Amino acid sequence: MIIGVLVDEEYHVQDTIISNKMTECIKHIHGSINLIKTKYPDVVIDGSILILRPCAQNGKGIKNYIRLDYVDEKGKNRVRMWNLRQC
């Protein structure tokens, strides 16, 4: 089951994320992601869009986190990060 698309900082597709644990992580994310859906219509997962990309925890060092940028139901930009070891 493909549950995400991993892209680099410039949104070039690097890999697909296939992980049941990642699915469990993403189940905690609620809200509208219409802004991302409009900008990146090719990345669609279960009717929702997930832009997943590698990053470091504070912008420096090894990119051992997955970052998800999304828009919540109030239209606010949100970021969720997971350590790759967790997923």
What do the PLM-derived regions correspond to, one by one?
Residues 1-13:
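Short aromatic-glycine-(Arg/Gly/Cys) micro-motifs in beta-strand/loop hairpins
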Residues 4, 18-20, 38, 53:
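Serine/threonine-rich, low-complexity intrinsically disordered segments
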Residues 10-26, 80:
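A short, exposed loop/beta-hairpin motif centered on an aromatic-Gly-Thr core
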Residues 22-26, 30-33, 37:
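Residue-level detector of alpha-helical secondary structure
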Residues 34-87:
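Short, mixed-charge low-complexity intrinsically disordered segments
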